[in-house]
Regions:
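N-terminal positively charged helical leader segments and presequences
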Residues: 1-93
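RNA substrate-binding interface of SAM-dependent RNA methyltransferases
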Residues: 15, 26, 33, 94-162
Length: 162
């Protein structure tokens, strides 16, 4: 769920938040968790405290409100909403020159499907995903982040005009 007032995205799900902690802990603005998963996030809480980040233990119902889903698995991290950069010819040319692969998507409307594609791309070492600038295309959402199970930390997402 996006908090448009603060330009934030809720990242929920154990695997997604753990990969975020491992690869980009600096992205986490606030962390909320239930008592049963609290011991698994002690290290992250120390990092957040050191950098004046906020962490808080909350009941599961509060986490549902934060992320808009019952599928939070006891943890929600608030991050700045990721920007999707437009793809330019120079970038695509660089990929070709370096032998990098990309996944090109066309109107994957379901956020869960988009997240599963991101997860698969990350697993296979594909670092670039290109989506159309189209209202029917799913984007980076709380749901897609959760379903990607940490894959969002390994890919860059670009957009092209339809």
């Amino acid at each position: 769920m996006k908090n448009t007032q603060r330009n934030e995205l809720a990242v929920c799900g154990f695997a997604a938040v753990k990969k975020l902690e491992k690869n980009h802990p600096e992205k986490i603005r606030r962390l909320y968790f239930t008592s049963d998963v609290a011991p698994k996030f002690g290290g992250l809480c120390k990092k957040l405290a050191k950098n004046h980040g906020i962490y808080n233990q909350k009941p599961a119902k509060d986490l549902e409100k934060l992320c808009g889903s019952v599928h939070h698995q006891g943890v929600v991290a608030m991050i700045e909403s990721p920007a999707i950069e437009p793809l330019d010819f120079a970038m695509a040319e660089k990929w070709a020159k370096n032998g990098e692969h990309a996944v090109l998507l066309d109107r994957i409307g379901n956020a869960n499907n988009f997240g599963a594609i991101v997860r698969s791309a990350a697993f296979f070492g594909i670092k670039n995903i290109v989506i159309p600038q189209d209202e029917s295309q799913s984007s980076i959402t709380t749901s897609s982040y959760r379903v990607a199970e940490g894959g969002m930390e390994y890919v860059s997402i670009y957009s092209v005009s339809s």
